[in-house]
């Protein structure tokens, strides 16, 4: 019977990247709905689907953490990042639900600017997570850390 002392490579960065891409999709959907001023049942359901997918990814990441002895970065950092990414999706979902519930006029200028900021932040976050495993590119992951807009 042969033993494999090398741990099976777990793709934490791939799952975190999927979670970040999911945030971008939800932010894109939110931004489009704000620009159209349309938060109907279908739009809110789409955003809820992104949020549900994020919950699933977050649970999978936590399950992998519980089954993995050696992680590429500190396990608490992976856990915190996975939960924070899930929280972002929860907040986008909550905003969409409240806009629909209270029948707010989402096409106001301040809402459009807010949706643009959320979208730009989501894209910068996805870019940072995408390059997180590459330490050479990490300092140049995005312009937001320097206080600039993309």
Where are these regions (language model features)?
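Cytosolic, long alpha-helical scaffolding segments
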Residues: 1-150
């Amino acid at each position: 019977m042969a033993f494999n002392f090398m741990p099976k490579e777990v793709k934490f960065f791939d799952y975190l990247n999927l979670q970040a891409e999911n945030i971008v999709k939800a932010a894109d959907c939110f931004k489009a709905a704000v620009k159209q001023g349309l938060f109907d049942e279908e739009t809110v359901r789409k955003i809820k689907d992104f949020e549900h997918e994020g919950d699933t990814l977050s649970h999978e990441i936590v399950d992998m953490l519980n089954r993995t002895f050696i992680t590429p970065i500190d396990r608490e950092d992976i856990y915190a990042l996975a939960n924070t990414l899930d929280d972002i999706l929860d907040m986008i979902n909550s905003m969409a639900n409240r806009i629909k519930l209270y029948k707010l006029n989402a096409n106001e200028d301040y809402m459009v600017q807010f949706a643009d900021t959320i979208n730009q932040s989501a894209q910068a976050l996805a870019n940072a997570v995408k390059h997180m495993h590459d330490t050479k590119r990490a300092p140049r992951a995005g312009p937001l850390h320097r206080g600039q807009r993309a």
